[in-house]
Amino acid sequence: MRCVHFGECGSCTLALPYEDQLNFKANFIADKFREFFDGELEIFSSKPQRYRSRAEFGIWHENDEIYYTMHGSRSKFIKISECLKVDESIAALMPRLLEELGTSNELKSKIFGVEFISTSELCAVILLYHKRLEGLEAAFSELAKRLGVKIVARSRGQKISSDERELCDSFEINGLRYALNFGDSAFIQPNKCVNEKMISWAMNAVQNAEDMLEMYCGHGNFTIPLAGKFRRVLATEISKSSIANALKNCERNGIGNIKFLRMSAEELMSAFSGERGFRRLEGVNLADFTFSHVLVDPPRAGLEASVINFIKNYENIVYISCNPQTLYENLKELSLTHKATKFAMFDQFANTNHIECGVVLKKR
């Protein structure tokens, strides 16, 4: 990776040719998890550059000029002129946005950050401010028209959108195309190519399927494509906006066998144990489901002990992890009742130390 900021920017940390990076990560995962899995590790690579469809940068003000910034490796931040990780759409947009903002005192005043999201249909730019935004609606709308993007401006307690277009991305899994709506503040997998590989791997890992229970489902990134493998799916998520988009995604993709519930993991477990009732479960009889599989895609903190004890009851577990250390700790407990039958490494973030994994566990 020939980035002019490598070594100063704290984002990319692996100064190795890409194949060597991949081998380094694969060897690390194989060694770390050898006590749980002694089969063949499946390895899924990324493009070395231009793979991120979502990226965030700080904005630095200096002598009436503004610059993009990133966290520095030896300093709090560094000014950057380019980023080789962002995809082609974002890379082309970055200098144009900076030029537009730099020529407008009202738009550059008190701005401290910017986020880019590119989809197959639309690019969105989220501008972050330390000031009130009243009276700037027209300026944001004109900026959006000049750049050909959707602008979302945010300040504490305020949000202004240049238009009402929704973010939606499409992808192909095993020959089938899907389109998913998501919110501008929702979590998404920023590496589209590797995300497709993750979903395809999970689909191919499912055998002898009946019903699926999914926790931490978001807007349906895994749920929607996997639904075709199961008779019925029950999927839970705590975010109200993500559930709203998940419901839209069912309709958009013509899928009718998923029941989405806005529930935390703790609430779901209480519902299953019968400790309390929930109005959100009206019309849903949990006893009607025959869950052959449970899919979990938790945050970096991994699964809490109560969730581990809960999912131990299921025959098959598909665990998607964004943190090898918490995955390792969770597998210490899950391996008491389940055996890892498939293990995959997904290189979501080339040139960094970040590693994502997928594990299929079957009850002993």
From Swiss-Prot:
The active site is at residues 322, 356. It catalyses: uridine(54) in tRNA + S-adenosyl-L-methionine = 5-methyluridine(54) in tRNA + S-adenosyl-L-homocysteine + H(+); uridine(341) in tmRNA + S-adenosyl-L-methionine = 5-methyluridine(341) in tmRNA + S-adenosyl-L-homocysteine + H(+). S-adenosyl-L-methionine binds at residues 189, 216, 221, 237, 297. It comes from the Bacteria. Its EC number is 2.1.1.-, 2.1.1.35. One of its GO terms (cellular component) is cytosol. Keywords: Methyltransferase, S-adenosyl-L-methionine, Transferase, tRNA processing. CDD domains: AdoMet_MTases (cd02440). GO terms for biological process: methylation; tRNA processing. One of its GO terms (molecular function) is tRNA (uracil(54)-C5)-methyltransferase activity, S-adenosyl methionine-dependent. It is an enzyme of class 2 (transferase). Belongs to the class I-like SAM-binding methyltransferase superfamily. RNA M5U methyltransferase family. TrmA subfamily. NCBIfam families: trmA_only (TIGR02143). Dual-specificity methyltransferase that catalyzes the formation of 5-methyluridine at position 54 (m5U54) in all tRNAs, and that of position 341 (m5U341) in tmRNA (transfer-mRNA). This is tRNA/tmRNA (uracil-C(5))-methyltransferase. It comes from Campylobacter curvus (strain 525.92). The gene is trmA.
